[in-house]
From Swiss-Prot:
Keywords: DNA-directed RNA polymerase, Magnesium, Metal-binding, Nucleotidyltransferase, Transcription, Transferase, Zinc. The gene is rpoC. Its cofactor is Mg(2+); Zn(2+). Its EC number is 2.7.7.6. Binds 1 Mg(2+) ion per subunit. Binds 2 Zn(2+) ions per subunit. The lineage of its organism: Bacteria, Bacillati, Bacillota, Bacilli, Bacillales. HAMAP family: RNApol_bact_RpoC. Pfam families: RNA_pol_Rpb1_1 (PF04997), RNA_pol_Rpb1_2 (PF00623), RNA_pol_Rpb1_3 (PF04983), RNA_pol_Rpb1_4 (PF05000), RNA_pol_Rpb1_5 (PF04998). It catalyses: RNA(n) + a ribonucleoside 5'-triphosphate = RNA(n+1) + diphosphate. It comes from Listeria innocua serovar 6a (strain ATCC BAA-680 / CLIP 11262). It is an enzyme of class 2 (transferase). This is DNA-directed RNA polymerase subunit beta'.
Amino acid sequence: MLDVNNFEYMKIGLASPDKIRSWSHGEVKKPETINYRTLKPERDGLFCERIFGPMKDWECSCGKYKRVRYKGVVCDRCGVEVTKSKVRRERMGHIELAAPVSHIWYFKGIPSRMGLVMDMSPRALEEIIYFASYVVTEPGDTPLEKKQLLSEREYRVYREKYGKGFSAGMGAEAIKKILADIDLEKETNDLKEELKSAQGQRRTRAIRRLEVMEAFRNSGNNPSWMVLDVLPVIPPEIRPMVQLEGGRFATSDLNDLYRRVINRNNRLKRLLDLGAPNIIVQNEKRMLQEAVDALIDNGRRGRPVTGPGNRPLKSLSHMLKGKQGRFRQNLLGKRVDYSGRSVIVVGPNLKMYQCGLPKEMALELFKPFVMKELVGRGLAHNIKSAKRKIERMAPEIWDVLEEVIREHPVLLNRAPTLHRLGIQAFEPTLVEGRAIRLHPLVCTAYNADFDGDQMAVHVPLSAEAQAEARILMLAAQNILNPKDGKPVVTPSQDMVLGNYYLTLERENAVGEGTIFKDINEAQLAYQNGYVHLHSRIAVFAGSIPNERFTDEQRKQLLITTVGKLIFNTILPKSFPYINEPTKFNLEIETPAKYFVDTTTDVRAHIAAQELIDPFKKKILGNIIAEVFKKFHITETSKMLDRMKDLGFKISTKAGMTVGIADILTLEEKHEILEKAHDTVEKITKSFRRGLITDDERYERVIGVWNAAKDEIQGKLILSLDRLNPIFMMQDSGARGNISNFTQLAGMRGLMADPSGRIVELPITSNFREGLTVLEYFISTHGARKGLTDTALKTADSGYLTRRLVDVAQDVIIREDDCGTDRGLTIKAIREGTEIIEPLEERLEGRYSRKTIRHPETKEVIARENDLITEAIATQIVDAGIEEVTIRSAFTCNTKHGVCKKCYGKNLATGTEVEVGEAVGIIAAQSIGEPGTQLTMRTFHTGGVAGDDITQGLPRIQEIFEARNPKGQAIITEVGGEVVSIEEGRDRQQEITIQGTDDRRSYNIPYTARLRVEEGSIVERGEALTEGSVDPKALIRVRDVLSVQEYLLAEVQKVYRMQGVEIGDKHVEVMVRQMLRKIRVMDTGDTNILPGTLMDIHTFTEANRDAILSGSQPATGRPVLLGITKASLETDSFLSAASFQETTRVLTDAAIKGKRDELLGLKENVILGKLVPAGTGIGRYRKLKSEVIKETAEVTDEITNI
């Protein structure tokens, strides 16, 4: 067998008849499959053992030779070679066709490749192939032209007139003759000549023909091979036939299709031998052609061949296509051994890196390991008895199992795996029961909850796999989210509530103002009921083991609460003592105002102080981020476990309950509603008098009700007791938000109808009072729409992720520095006056392109190619610098990937990115994963002339597919001053712009809102009206970089509006893939074809060679491709074929004789090679291990050291 890791590239081409015969082990002559009585394959049939190999290992068909000792013997009685039955998966056969047939892929595709080569229309071809018309193959000395079509009558007339003076034929034979006569050299030269003068349609056609001709010429494929003389038969194990219970047989559709071909082929042979009339032979040939068409691609032409129950049969093409096809079902996603799945339950007492594995599941997963160990320990004599022991569940196997799984990580995966945190490694601990135990903190990353979710377990087998799982995938290593570098393991729900309750402060609580000598004394007093968790007390600061206190502070008293003392015990000693939820306290030190002299009257001091807010979810997140920055992974994961345990413990002690009595109603609600009703009445009167339009009335009514709801909400918040359990839950960020509470205790407010329009009748009741029937009915609209939207959004978002992954899967960090001298100038992204993404966030973790100096002091803040840390970014912004040039993926020169410097920091680890990191896939996941959170709906902007501005998921798709946006803005093609804005007829406006050497006017429809006024200075490509710019128009007016900047800003706007943060670099990687191609306009002296779509790198290299040899380089214009188009235009045909339009991609690749260099990830997964990313990248695979020096024998026991 072929060693999969040892080949460089894969090539695809057309097969010549001789090639097909050379693959074959014999000709299939009969349509029979197996004998139903003996269940043995029929000889020369579709399952023949002589052709395809024996059914049983080392046994011939007649049984004369049995056993492995006859290996390689060919039986003299039945002609079957004695070998393994596995050969039935790889041996092919063939069918010698009695008449040539055309291959439907090349004749039917769009554009028809056969049509282009022969310069005939697909309609004409169809008439010839399916025996409706004759075609002249040799005109001889007649007035007929070659390739002219003749009807039956015309043919007869010319035959009588000229006799044998010309030859014409029909069917694939005639096509084959014409194809064989084509002189590719001559045709290409003629086409190149024609191109010099041709225009319009003729030029396009010539370019397309030239492309196909060149493809045939360069690949060495012969055009006549598009017509088949021999048909290959695929190995029988790939189209199996199995016996069902009850003696019936189930068979692959391919066998039916092959049977039809063989039957018709044999019948045609017989008719030809008998010398049957022409019309009968022609009909049989047409039927053979149709049978072969159905075998190759059933349903492509005419009605598909159907099996029982009118179901179309699955042909060879269908075997490859779609989600259930060979590519996506078996090559890119396989079922694997050493895996299992079960329901998950919470494991609150696990460590961050552990998971609980049910005993019986662990036993099954680690069976071979346990068997080996049983034999190794002498508990079983051989593997067989070890296996028997395991099956009987003998008591001694459990100790062995524990030993085996110790330090052997397993992978846990929850579907849908939207980003790389959907698969993480854990160390298993054995648990009773049949459910997997999962650590509560990793739930956010998996998006898991315990309402019946299931998870899959996989066992990494090899030492390398275990090492990678432990070092890279262990849950304790994956604390940061790759999309924005923020911690993803923040506590939630009970943990948040517990820590919130712990850090609450209460006035006049039991024991307020008591002074304690140390933490232990305070805890003792708390346990005995002398003080409360929330009591504000004083503790001698010197007794607190915090390294941040100054010597002065150690002599003083620290004002804090018992709860905060306990909370601070979970933090590292050198972390500031956290007494208030402020940035200063977290990052620098405990504010000095909390330290008082020992002589102070503590009670009076405390009584005079304001209460401090407790620690909410966001603060806990900030604490984790801060601990991570200062102490790195190990300490952070330990601290997280302590925070989790403390949270659960205290929330249990707090004993939060929710009852209907906790929902207090608002006294003033009635007055507010009365007032709103009056206002609405007034508005309606104004409308009746004709003072306002219906639209204005609607807008105002909605405004009134929204204001009323907000007022009720505001009053509710004020009237609430801070210790109200519902308030605590939502204030801490554990569950729910203020709008939920308003609906419970205030009013539900306005609802939307199915079209998304707001119904102007508000729901004035709340859930505490109960809704009227009408109110309940109105509210069902919104509820139902919410559910359907969610279901649709999930599918859309998943498909978006798939396309993103496909377009960027080969973007890998390939080198340390690409040495580019270009960069991207960035400033804060704004929408109007609102800052969407501040400069600081855009700078952090990037490399500077130029030296950055302070504008006033001229002191160097960062040198060229320095990494901009958070501190430097803050310095830059504080210095008042508004734009900075940084290294960016947009300007990276690395071929097939990005370099370290242009990419910047790896957000998932907070350190420099490694060579081999698959940043393309990470980018695709980071953009696709939050897709489900984006809303589906297109918002109606207020105002009479409100255009629909697409937002949310549809807008993201619009950007990445480079479609013409809805609500398109008009852009200017010249830069200059707006000299006039005049109103034309139909209330249109005309804007005139005076450039330096050009003057342009634009007509603006009256519904559009202007962004400019007279006297404004505009740049080329700037939008004159509100709306989205069409990036394809922008690329015509401006350069590539400004299009890239625009797309980046637009994507960020959509995500940030929804409160989702994504690192710029991910969007940069994706956008760069959309602008990789260039359309050649003028070929110069190069041998590139005009109109070709080329990779920018290939184009530049071709031009460099041309300039070096002193000839004229080609010119081209950059093209913006949507992600689907860009994935299909990739150089790798394997990757493109496994994405979409499989047959088209393969047809094209076969004609061009394409080579797939296996640079991306998908191609290698399809072939079963190691992916060229991470430790599989070339530079790591080629490392050889060498012994540096032998170490001396270690005699000390480890415990003694």
